Amino acid sequence: MIVTPLKHSGIHLSSGTLQRRNMPLDAVFIDSIPSGTLTPLKDLVKYQKSSLKVNGHKKNQLLEIRTSNNKDLFQSTMLSEATLPNSSLDISVIKPSMDRLRNEMIYESPGKIFQRMKAKVQRDKQEQLTRSSSMLGSPQGEHTKDFPPNTDKKAQLQQTYICEEKQTSVQSNDPSLGDPPILNQEQKNVSASCISKKALTRAQFGGQVLHSKESPVRITVSKKNTFVLGGIDCTYEKFENTDVNTISSLCVPIKNHSQSITSDNDVTTERTAKEDITEPNEEMMSRRTILQDPIKNTSKIKRSSPRPNLTLSGRSQRKCTKLETVVKEVKKYQAVHLQEWMIKVINNNTAICVEGKLVDMTDVYWHSNVIIERIKHNELRTLSGNIYILKGLIDSVSMKEAGYPCYLTRKFMFGFPHNWKEHIDKFLEQLRAEKKNKTRQETARVQEKQKSKKKDAEDKETYVLQKASITYDLNDNSLERTEVPTDPLNSLEQPTSGKERRHPLLSQKRAYVLITPLRNKKLIEQRCIDYSLSIEGISDFFKAKHQEESDSDIHGTPSSTSKSQETFEHRVGFEGNTKEDCNECDIITARHIQIPCPKSKQMLTNDFMKKNKLPSKLQKTENQIGVSQYCRSSSHLSSEENEVEIKSRTRARNTKERLNRERENTNHITKDILLISETEGERACYITPKRPRSCYITPKRPRSSAKESHYKSAVSKDFLTEGKASDRTSRQLLDHLPGLTDDEEWSEQELQKLHCAFTSLPKHKPGFWSDVAMAVGSRTADECQKKYTEEPQGQGSRKHGSKKKQANKVQNGEKDSADAKTIKITAKVGTLKRKRQMRDCLEHLAKDNHDDFFTATPLQKQRIQLPSFQYSQDDDFLLDMDRDPASPSSIITSPLRSTTPQCQHFSPSMLAAIERNNCDRYVYQMQKNAKKYGKSNGGLVWGNIRKKTVKTDLSSPPPTRKALFNKDLGKNTDISKYFIDDTESDEEEKDYYFSNSD
């Protein structure tokens, strides 16, 4: 049994009409259309009148139509002995315009209607295929709205959905009814139409129209198919065993807007939903109602399994189909297929997941939950229970970009292996350990920074310029010095030592003069004016020599800083002392009053002292100045000389101790340079009382004794020897000290090493000048290259000339200095001695005396040194034949091939010095022998020079092929006479190959 609602404006039917507005049309029944014809929609109007007369003239029609004044009418149809079609067709549903009257007919073009029909059929077929074959699901959803034309009454709609189910045959309980014959079935499409005065709508689904000759009151339900009535709630519950037994029923429309179901047998129903269709914001209730037909017999209804009702709101009712679709999709996507997948670490390096692209959807990335189980190499189960299927290989490029190691990618290249947990646990443990190490390193870095800041603050406090702490106790009346005992060890204590200052007793407290450092000239002048002091030599004192400091001097010598720190030595002499006081000599230490230098130099000094970490005693010793205090009268001028001598001895002793301590640290070469600069830069001023309550300031020149100069020279010599004997590290230190090696002249030994290394080492190899510098030992590569390119012509002559000069000095017993006078040419012309004198004279000429065109050219420093190509065994054999052409037989049989060494581009004899004496003597003998050959004898030519014959044991190899000749052939024939040598004549003996005429 199927009950269909009418199509009415404001009421939507099945899913096919969910997005369309329904317009009332006149119904055209399928019986009015001739069978076997395809009638267009525009021709269906012809059959409207005939379809209205079907109830009056045809008895085989099972439909009864009654019109009334009510606007809502329903059409009931009884189906039996047939199955429902796969899809129900809604034909020609046209959207009405709200501005016009509802009873006005509006037509669409047939082409659009046909396309809409076709699309709907295809869509319904696809939905039917996805459903279960045993039951029919509910429609997808129903979007309902109410558009009341004149009244505010709610339209009530009772919908019933059909579920097909097999059952056994049931015999009728009514004895008056016989067994009617089985009705014939015919499946046809029914077009929907609507007939009413204003807006009467009837909808008729495609079904089966039953034709029978007898009365339509008696209908026998077949054994095959029965239908169970159910509401919307049935789609969300599983059907149980339900039996529907029906003998005869009749459905007719009633005026009370509902349907009545009459039956003679017990009918078991699921439930029918009665919905109140209202505005979208109003709630729509569903309840089960079964109305009995008052005309026919009452039906007995039994509910076998009652179920609770569901209350659905308007929004939830709209989204019923969406919810059903989502549930199906969730069940469907429990097995997710991923391609181009990779492994990702999650949950703070404690678990992994897989991420990749979905196979069903393009360019959509999807990542899983925590992987807990391996089903197959490409199937995994997650913590949520879903199954992920991996397609293809792992995305190694993404894994590498994400920073995962290569071995992990290789292990999981084709999927998850059996021991995947071991690899993952090992990798995660490694990641956690690295994270802990990074955290520890960052914590240690922060602590080191804090410690360094504290140390810097302490060092700044330590090296801050301190105020002078020397006090002088003066008597107001006699202006005589009262001796205050001073401990030199206590005076050397730093103010940051934490010890309290020992204050003198109350009886010893007198007026004190505090000498504090003054930062500039104006302050000194102002202070002297305030205390009635005379000023002398301040302008000379403030002319500090500031040297430029480069970035490479960070490790180096703050000599300019030490020079700019001027040192005052305070000496206060008093008159009126007895001679007994002169015998007493107390050496007290006074702190220096330091004039501050620029901030950059102060920072350089502080950094240098931090790095070198000089002992505190050494720093204190540098600040000590021995001051001998003698009590003398106003006329004691001679005592100043003794005081100067004592001070110089004290300073020399302090310098000696400082040098001895610094020589122990041979790794720090810069300390020696610092000491030299500090010793040279010390300057001091004395404040000497000239009159009572007045004194003057005189600048003191830097004084250095013989011992100091001796130590300075020793320091410089030690520094040079260390620089020459050191390796690359010492050369790097020398590179950071500009002005030390660049200004020094090259010694003869260094020049000789330079030229020997240049000629012996291969020039085409990279790092040639570095190898030359290694051979020289005391120069860098840049210095060697610069020296060789600056003086290219005079190097060889200087080297050989110096050797020749030394040899001549040894032979003649002369001991001349380096600045010898110009050699005089005393020998006769044409002698060997004159030749040597001329050579020596030319070698000792100054370079400024003559101009060299090649040295003056601007391209002199841009000369390109061509590499000397060395023969390699990998060269082509044709080139080898060109270098040393030889026949194959000579190569095999020559005994010298194995004994003669292969000659390179130089030989060891070439590296030795050239013996000028032997060469000159040889050339001189050649010239002397040339006189023997006059023009009559042909002169001096190469043919006349006697050569020594070289005896070799070379023997010609035996011929490889012997020609067989007949022995009698030479005797019997005249061939042998052609091979007889001609006899030599006497005339040819006088003729020579070389003639004088040439």
UniProtKB/Swiss-Prot annotation:
Q: Which residues carry this modification: Phosphoserine?
A: S9, S109, S134, S169, S258, S638, S639, S726, S872, S955, S985
Kindly provide the name given to this protein in its UniProt entry. Answer: Mis18-binding protein 1
Quaternary organization: Interacts with SP1. Interacts with MIS18A. Identified in a complex containing MIS18A, OIP5/MIS18B, MIS18BP1, RBBP7 and RBBP4. Interacts with KAT7/HBO1. Interacts (via N-terminus) with FLNA (via N-terminus).
Polar residues composition bias: which ranges? 488-497
Residue ranges annotated for the SANT domain, each copy included = 741-796
From start to end residue, where is composition biased (Basic and acidic residues)?
A: 142-153, 644-660, 812-821
Q: Where is this region: Disordered?
A: 122-153, 438-460, 476-502, 638-660, 784-821, 976-998
Which residues are reported to carry the modification Phosphothreonine? T516, T578, T688
**CDD domains, per the entry:** SANT
Using the UniProt record, give the first listed, main subcellular location: nucleus
Can you tell me which residues the record assigns to a coiled coil? none
